[in-house]
Regions:
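A short beta-strand-turn-helix
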Residues: 23-39
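Bacterial N-terminal signal peptides
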Residues: 7-16
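Positively charged n-region of N-terminal signal peptides that target proteins for export
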Residues: 1-4
Length: 119
């Protein structure tokens, strides 16, 4: 009996993890740059992080001009929400995700308006 339960448990876990893997592949990454760029930067960001907003405002334009637009670098943005507001904003960012980073820049540019709730 223990052997049957163990086998069923292993089958169940294997089935559940394969379903999860298929779902995670359907998430379209927000990125900019050529797919075949030699360098890919993966940026883990929280949409309520002031440092991340500063990166999008002050560093990213130069990075885009000097490296991304020339096809040398590709940047991929991944959500790493640090609070519930960032989590909800990341869901908004994925809702109408065309794979481009415009929504990220819009959310970061208006971060001071939406990230802090009234207490």
């Amino acid at each position: 009996m223990k052997k049957i339960v163990s086998i069923l448990f292993i089958i169940f876990i294997g089935f559940a993890t394969s379903l999860y893997a298929e779902d995670s592949q359907s998430i379209k990454r927000i990125s900019e740059g050529k797919e075949n760029a030699k360098i890919t930067i993966i940026a883990y960001e929280s949409l309520t992080c002031g440092h991340c907003a500063d990166f999008h405002k002050n560093v990213y334009p130069g990075l885009k001009k000097d490296f991304i637009d020339k096809g040398l670098v590709r940047i991929e943005f991944r959500h790493f929400p640090l609070d519930i507001a960032a989590f909800n904003a990341s869901k908004i960012g994925q809702c109408n995700n065309d794979g481009e980073s415009n929504i990220m820049h819009i959310l970061y540019s208006g971060q001071k308006k939406w990230a802090k709730g009234k207490t």
